[in-house]
């Protein structure tokens, strides 16, 4: 109501914008996980514009994907719920959503999730230890699969053998 808006403004609160979810189930065929169902009624309507006018991740990501003609998105399984929400955003823009694939997250040698606190396993940390980029890419191409580790010389070689159906569901150890 107008009274509520004025009250909030007088308290110094500024408005933010949310994307209204449908409350329906968002169903999609994931390239790695198979059929995925995200129940948007169990999610809060995502904030898309902060009080300061800055945008949050989901909506700009969707718009960028539309503008760039992105057809496939492969990302960590921690983004499955985001994908269900983003599918609704694509639909609201009158666009088809890309094809999604969500891979298990990598863990360290102890089975713990990677963290920013472990700088030794960061790209910079590996570079500082003189690891060759293609050696890292070669290893990464086989983690979480039954594929033997090979020494590849180009990303094209890796993309030629990459088969998402061979990815396991358990976290890969690095």
Whereabouts are the PLM-identified features?
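NTP-dependent nucleotidyl-transfer catalytic core
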Residues: 1-80, 86-87, 93-99
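Catalytic adenosine-cofactor/nucleotide-binding cores of aminoacyl-tRNA synthetases and other
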Residues: 81, 93-174
């Amino acid at each position: 109501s107008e009274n509520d808006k004025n009250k909030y403004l007088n308290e110094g609160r500024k408005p933010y914008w949310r994307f209204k979810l449908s409350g329906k189930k968002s169903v999609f065929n994931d390239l790695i996980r198979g059929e995925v169902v995200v129940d948007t009624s169990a999610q809060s309507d995502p904030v898309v514009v902060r009080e300061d006018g800055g945008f949050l991740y989901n909506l700009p990501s969707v718009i960028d994907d539309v503008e760039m003609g992105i057809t496939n998105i492969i990302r960590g399984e921690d983004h499955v719920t985001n994908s269900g929400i983003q599918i609704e955003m694509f639909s609201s823009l009158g666009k088809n959503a890309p094809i999604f694939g969500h891979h298990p997250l990598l863990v360290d040698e102890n089975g713990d999730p990677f963290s920013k606190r472990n700088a030794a396993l960061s790209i910079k940390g590996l570079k500082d230890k003189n690891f060759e980029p293609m050696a890292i890419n070669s290893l990464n191409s086989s983690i979480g699969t039954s594929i033997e580790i090979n020494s590849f010389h180009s990303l094209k070689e890796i993309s030629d053998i990459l088969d998402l159906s061979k990815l396991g569901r358990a976290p890969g150890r690095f």
